[in-house]
């Protein structure tokens, strides 16, 4: 009895020492982290962060603490990187140490670390390598996907002609077109524009994407451990994601029934074949959960980001009609009114290219960027960032860095034009992020945006119910994503 009592005391003493040492080490590390406002227990810096003006709050903190600072999203610390220099030093110069995915509470709640976008470590590396190779096989970066994009754009042009110049909301017109391009790769087919299930899926994507940028979405990022047990619209957003997963699961079942291992038809087939090849590997990352989540990643990201950018671009071109007029002029000179635009035309159209880049810079569709996580304790500048710390590359601060863009808050294509009117690249053009976890859909997105804008503007002029000076381009939401204000417009045949 005495021996067992002494053993218990020893065990408890050892545990106490370990806990004290762990707390001491954590506090020691926190003291060496980048500066920031003092957090309160549990709520962190909630009182300093206005969820409706999240970016503005961060901007003020940057003025006080410098380009590398720490905030506490609820109880968890997060390092914010502000401006090109800080983001480049972290994501490029220390790419491997920042190659894990940071915490994105809502998506982590749903994806649980599966899928190519929200996974880390070896899982992320294998899925990313496979996804890039497979998408390339199905035309990524080649004429195959360009031909699909051109074909899909022809359906859009006809749909816009059928409006007969009426005032419409362009949202679902663009999301249907963009989504059909990625659908042809991951599902092997496109959807008819009046397909009710397709329209339902697009609604699910849009609503869950917008939820992330609402005040409730920002609160969930800070207090998810509590809020996922409370009533609220976070549960509806979760159901939207579940609806998307259910649809993909049905698609996978269809492919399984008709699979020919020697002739993959789409991304799902290729993944199923890889699953069969590795079924005896106990450590394989090619299993059903990763198939569902990776396909959902591609379908979601391949639909909403380009659709939002294009829609926002329409609004900007209506506010600045002189810019649209110069694009029309260049399109007529280089392509004409009858020939179908091709992506190779962008090499001969410096003004149009500059406008499309400026739209992406100004729209800034994912302002904070997706967070990274440190794979080990790292030294960054004069600071120590502990392993597992979330690091946000604030992409908006790079895209609006005054060192690279003379008037960063103005919409001005001259940001991407030299003195001779030729297209000028910028190292600070990072809407797709950089480093080990950059968006591998970048080449597809650039090609899509060029084909969409040139083909639509070859055929139509844009008209707003409002005078240009009255058009408000302030985003409806600006935190996780930049969501344009609701607007209507007319597509008038040229």
Swiss-Prot record:
Enzyme class of the recorded protein, top EC level: oxidoreductase
Coiled coil: none
Entry membrane topology: Peripheral membrane protein
Residues at which heme binds: 439
Source domain of life: Eukaryota
InterPro entries recorded: Cyt_P450, Cyt_P450_CS, Cyt_P450_E_grp-I, Cyt_P450_E_grp-I_CYP2A-like, Cyt_P450_sf, Cytochrome_P450_fam2
Gene Ontology MF: a single term: iron ion binding
GO biological process: coumarin metabolic process; epoxygenase P450 pathway; xenobiotic metabolic process
Catalyzed reactions per annotation: an organic molecule + reduced [NADPH--hemoprotein reductase] + O2 = an alcohol + oxidized [NADPH--hemoprotein reductase] + H2O + H(+)
Cofactor(s) listed: heme
Family assignment from sequence similarity: Belongs to the cytochrome P450 family.
Function: Highly active in 7-ethoxycoumarin O-deethylation, and benzphetamine N-demethylation; moderately active in testosterone 7-alpha-hydroxylation, ethylmorphine N-demethylation, p-nitroanisole O-demethylation; and only slightly active in benzopyrene 3-hydroxylation, 7-ethoxyresorufin O-deethylation, testosterone 2-alpha-hydroxylation and testosterone 17-oxidation. Competent in the metabolic activation of aflatoxin B1.
The protein's name in its UniProt record: Cytochrome P450 2A8
